[in-house]
């Protein structure tokens, strides 16, 4: 059996960096090199301050960096020396041309394939790690075949990641399963077994599943679509709960105890975010349309539509509770990452809520413990989010949550950071304008509602009526939809 001794990973982002750090940690005899064209990102990986925040990541990196784990911008040499090359580059949703707003843009995958074949010789395994549409492996193989040379044998595998940001290291060290897809040929199966041997250093063999490449690619899209579907499903019920007086948490607990349903991903919120869920569901929608399956496409499109509705509904609730205007009012936004325990802001609901409030003229004071000021400004300066000098006029980045809340009309919790449960809300209430509102978009304060109301707060949360003096709000349809996929990024003023 072919033995993998050197691994190269192209892409030092949220997938490539943590994944290869754990592989190096678990396989000390394998030399792992993570490469990227972004020099500042590589410099960060080689510094005490890593470019991404993930619990446990720093300890893993420091345990093997400089021993068998290396970060470099020398892509060509890393490819030449490697037995296995992971492709772990971004596959964003297209913002132009055919499939705009839905199809995956594979230009970075194609660029990697061409660079790999140019710098390869002998036998090498090339593995998709990025989330890609079905048959992407076939496209890579066609590029390899069209540019082949003597004594070159490149085998293409699919090995999608199933880690969740915030628990990535735990997920990588103890995965539910490892999925490897390859050709159903002797050469393809040889490559599959070689990659299996790497994971068998720490993953039980029964947890390593092998399929053909198409099944592997579709499994990743389907997994994310099902998880997003569960969130949209419980969010739809949260709207019904608010209209009837039910509590969505109680409903979720009741149905989650049914073993056929389970209790995972039944947390109602202001909406899902992150780099994968929306992108992958839209990719699935586009695939179904391309294969002439319109009913299936419409079914999955509803997952995205419900997520958009939940965000617009929450923004409407804020505006209408504040006497139907937020113009020139200070509003504290607590949390900007798409979920706790990560600094990732991609498709974060905070961006959408901020956009809706800025359009109404609100002055936003934003605090997040892990998202740097520059990232918040970049996200809010997207042309689909803000206009001209809107961010400079309306957005302030606060150094702590108390500064953000000082003099505010309302506090809006958009990320479920644990620290928000521990804040001194009496101190916050004293410095806010009255009536003081808290809009809990993540239900992190569920156990504190009575205490907060005693202090004097008016509480609005997802899927439950809390404040008795509730002002009816306008239909969410009055807030127009927008998408971060609509336009290319512009250079922000930081």
UniProtKB/Swiss-Prot annotation:
Protein name as catalogued: UDP-glucose 6-dehydrogenase
Keyword flag Endoplasmic reticulum: no
UniProt cross-references to Pfam families, sorted A to Z: UDPG_MGDP_dh (PF00984), UDPG_MGDP_dh_C (PF03720), UDPG_MGDP_dh_N (PF03721)
Stretch list, region Disordered: 88-110, 466-494
GO terms assigned for molecular function: identical protein binding; NAD binding; UDP-glucose 6-dehydrogenase activity
Residues that, per the record, bind NAD(+): 11-16, 36, 41, 89-93, 130-132, 165, 276-279, 346
InterPro entries: 6-PGluconate_DH-like_C_sf, NAD(P)-bd_dom_sf, UDP-Glc/GDP-Man, UDP-Glc/GDP-Man_DH_C, UDP-Glc/GDP-Man_DH_C_sf, UDP-Glc/GDP-Man_DH_dimer, UDP-Glc/GDP-Man_DH_N, UDPglc_DH_euk
Record: active site: 161, 220, 276
Chain positions found as N6-acetyllysine: 107
Subunit structure: Homohexamer.
UniProt keyword annotation of Acetylation present: yes
Mechanisms controlling activity: UDP-alpha-D-xylose (UDX) acts as a feedback inhibitor. It binds at the same site as the substrate, but functions as allosteric inhibitor by triggering a conformation change that disrupts the active hexameric ring structure and gives rise to an inactive, horseshoe-shaped hexamer.
Ranges for region Important for formation of active hexamer structure: 321-325
Protein role: Catalyzes the formation of UDP-alpha-D-glucuronate, a constituent of complex glycosaminoglycans. Required for the biosynthesis of chondroitin sulfate and heparan sulfate. Required for embryonic development via its role in the biosynthesis of glycosaminoglycans. Required for proper brain and neuronal development.
Enzyme Commission number, as recorded: 1.1.1.22
Annotated Gene Ontology cellular component terms: nucleoplasm; nucleus
Catalytic reactions of this protein: UDP-alpha-D-glucose + 2 NAD(+) + H2O = UDP-alpha-D-glucuronate + 2 NADH + 3 H(+)
Originating species: Bos taurus (Bovine)
């Amino acid at each position: 059996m072919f033995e993998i001794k050197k691994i190269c990973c192209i892409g030092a982002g949220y997938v490539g960096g943590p994944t290869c750090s754990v592989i190096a940690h678990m396989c000390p005899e394998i030399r792992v090199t993570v490469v990227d064209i972004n020099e500042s990102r590589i410099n960060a990986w080689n510094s005490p301050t890593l470019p991404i925040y993930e619990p446990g990541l720093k300890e893993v990196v420091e345990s093997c960096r400089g021993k068998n784990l290396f970060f470099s911008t020398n892509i060509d040499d890393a490819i030449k020396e490697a037995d296995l090359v992971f492709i772990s580059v971004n596959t964003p949703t297209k913002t132009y041309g055919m499939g705009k707003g839905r199809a995956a843009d594979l230009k970075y995958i194609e660029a990697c394939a061409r660079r790999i074949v140019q710098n390869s010789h002998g036998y090498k395994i090339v593995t998709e790690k990025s989330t890609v549409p079905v048959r992407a492996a076939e496209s890579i193989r066609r590029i390899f075949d069209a540019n082949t040379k003597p004594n070159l044998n490149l085998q293409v595998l699919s090995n999608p990641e199933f880690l969740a940001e915030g628990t990535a290291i735990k997920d990588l060290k103890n995965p539910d399963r490892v999925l490897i897809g390859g050709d159903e040929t002797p050469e393809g199966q040889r490559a599959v077994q070689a990659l299996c041997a790497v994971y068998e250093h720490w993953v039980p063999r029964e947890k390593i599943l092998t399929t053909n490449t198409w099944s592997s690619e579709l499994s990743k899209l389907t997994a994310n679509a099902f998880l997003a579907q569960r969130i949209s499903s419980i969010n739809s019920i949260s709207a019904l709960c608010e209209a009837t007086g039910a509590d969505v948490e109680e409903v979720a607990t009741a149905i989650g105890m049914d073993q056929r349903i389970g209790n995972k991903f039944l947390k109602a919120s202001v909406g899902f975010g992150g780099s994968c869920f929306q992108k992958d569901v839209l990719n699935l929608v586009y695939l179904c349309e391309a294969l002439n399956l319109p009913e299936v496409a419409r079914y999955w499109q509803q997952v995205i539509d419900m997520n958009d509705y939940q965000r617009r509904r929450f923004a409407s609730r804020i505006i209408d509770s504040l006497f139907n205007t937020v113009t020139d009012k200070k509003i504290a936004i607590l949390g900007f990452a798409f979920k706790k325990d990560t600094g990732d802001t991609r498709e974060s609901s905070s961006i959408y809520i901020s956009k809706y409030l800025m359009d109404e003229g609100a002055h936003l004071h934003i605090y997040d413990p892990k998202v740097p000021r520059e990232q918040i400004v970049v996200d809010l300066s997207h042309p689909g989010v803000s206009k001209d000098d809107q961010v400079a006029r309306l957005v302030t980045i606060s150094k702590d949550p108390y500064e953000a809340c000082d003099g505010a009309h309302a506090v809006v919790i958009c990320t479920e950071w644990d620290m928000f449960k521990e804040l001194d809300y009496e101190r916050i209430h004293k410095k806010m304008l009255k009536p003081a509102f808290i809009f809990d978009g993540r239900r992190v304060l569920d156990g504190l509602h009575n205490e907060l109301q005693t202090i004097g707060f008016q509480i609005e949360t997802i899927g439950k009526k809390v404040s008795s003096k509730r002002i009816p709000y306008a239909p969410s349809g009055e807030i127009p939809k927008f998408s971060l996929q609509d336009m290319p990024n512009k250079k922000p003023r930081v």
